């Protein structure tokens, strides 16, 4: 219960954050200049909090909210094409009670899964600046501390993968330069007593100082429309997650 309360406080801090002037201005611009198809929407127009199950064993790290997706609806991956792919896959794998979500006040619930992002504000052209990523990093570090049951982290895209590794290093994980690749799975842990960072003799979760990292192409339109990421490829990622979680039970 304490971690749940702490996560709620963290969410409030995220929503009220104004550390990045460029992103604050951009959110105001997209809120005031809605495309015709969304004229009737009351845009969220603020940083987006993470959401999901506080007891989750799966942590998903995305890049950033979409300008007319999450920044409009008020929930990550809600109301955009990437979200359609993600929630469909989560539902099929048993992590979500719905295969689709269009607004934050629907009854979508995540089970054993928690969704966060590298940054919590929609950036212009979907490209956050390095300092903006650093400004948001403390939120991810705090989530690592609070989400103690996480056994596997799914990084959506290369930026999320790189920033996840950097954040884990900051909380004591000894991680070499691991290459990004769709479907690549790594197991890392904190260095203890000079032992190697790879450990096979303990359960992997954030509470024990060991975790698995799985990389995938981001389900962006750029990747899905070109065939770089297909439905079967994305489905296999979540089948792998189920296998890995099952092995740790």
Q: Which residues are covered by each model-predicted region?
A:
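A polyanion-binding, active-site-adjacent surface
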Residues: 2-182, 195-200, 210-246
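Conserved flavin/dinucleotide-binding core of flavoenzymes
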Residues: 185
């Amino acid at each position: 219960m304490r971690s749940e309360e702490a996560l709620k406080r963290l969410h409030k801090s995220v929503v009220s954050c104004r550390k990045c002037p460029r992103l604050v201005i951009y959110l105001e611009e997209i809120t005031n200049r809605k495309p015709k198809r969304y004229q009737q929407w009351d845009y969220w127009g603020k940083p987006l909090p993470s959401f999901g199950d506080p007891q989750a064993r799966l942590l998903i790290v995305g890049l950033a909210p979409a300008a007319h997706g999450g920044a409009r609806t008020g929930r990550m991956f809600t109301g955009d094409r990437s979200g359609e792919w993600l929630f469909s896959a989560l539902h099929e794998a048993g992590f979500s009670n719905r295969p689709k979500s269009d607004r934050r006040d629907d009854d979508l619930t995540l089970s054993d899964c928690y969704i966060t992002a590298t940054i919590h504000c929609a950036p212009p052209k979907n490209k956050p600046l390095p300092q903006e990523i650093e400004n948001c990093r403390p939120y991810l570090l705090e989530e690592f501390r609070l989400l103690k049951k996480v056994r596997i982290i799914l990084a959506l895209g290369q930026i999320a993968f790189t920033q996840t590794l950097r954040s884990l290093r900051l909380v004591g994980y000894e991680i070499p330069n691991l290459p990004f690749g769709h479907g690549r799975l790594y197991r890392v842990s904190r260095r203890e007593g000079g032992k190697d960072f790879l450990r096979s003799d303990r359960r992997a979760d954030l509470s024990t100082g060991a975790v698995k990292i799985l990389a995938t192409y981001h389900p962006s339109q750029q990747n899905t429309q070109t065939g770089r990421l297909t439905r079967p490829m994305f489905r296999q990622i979540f089948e792998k997650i189920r296998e890995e979680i099952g092995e740790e039970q």
